[in-house]
């Protein structure tokens, strides 16, 4: 958990707190059943005065009627006026791993992630369940689980681990009393959704270690990347934190031994497997457009993007056909990768810290402990 404080500081820096995303989009798989209008689901657009000077455009006009969003309230700030020159040195191409066209600036918006915390929103029921059912069905639906190939098992473990992490985030910051706007921990949810299913805990650790592994393998690229936002002091801090993370002894020792599953990405079937998994992530990314909760959609897209970036790195570095090629990551991919790593780190830490209480609840739990559907 030595890495967690570094990640917490890193994602608060100007470079890593803004994520480019398409929030308003049509569901390509089933008729749109409407947006979630709970106040905790929304992401609101805030006046220019809430953002640092380098992130403003003089041509942008705001009326006196602009909504003011305050930190600590459910709504969060959206910056639609970020100057692309702030992030010089980064390529701007459509990401083949995601469904949305990230070069379509008219449809994209910049979101301040620090003012849009991932937590309980009230989004649940059949609509939310349909999302996860669709995501899981992207994994080898034509085969029963016992016949899954190794790469499909890896994909399932990654999605299950991400699902577990999101459940932990909701349980760790839950709306206990809406009338008093009281937030706290829902330990029963943590126990029911994650702890009493050992495979879900294992998959959480698996995805955490895989993303860590990807970060270490991209260390040379990430160290040399430009984290320029126009704020010299903050940019130096960002570069320092990135180096602290990349060359931390705990990180290097934790990721020294490669995953056995990485071997499936090598050999003559590597290119076909890459294309297959890339298409799966495009489909999963498209499913995120069907999420009825705007804030949930934001974090779903970010974390799917981050996981796709981790796999992109591992495919590239472990591939035998990339000797003369240079790893290229988009700015948005790097932001998603580090924010995903931070969210996974937060989940692992919370599960670890709550372990004694969970074990106590387990001893007093008389219900079956076998697998149950999500």
What residues fall within each predicted segment?
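Secreted, propeptide-processed cysteine-rich mini-domains
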Residues: 4, 9-14, 23-27
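Long, low-complexity or tandemly repetitive, helically biased scaffold regions used
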Residues: 28-32, 41, 46-51, 60-63, ...
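Short, solvent-exposed mixed-charge patches
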Residues: 372-374
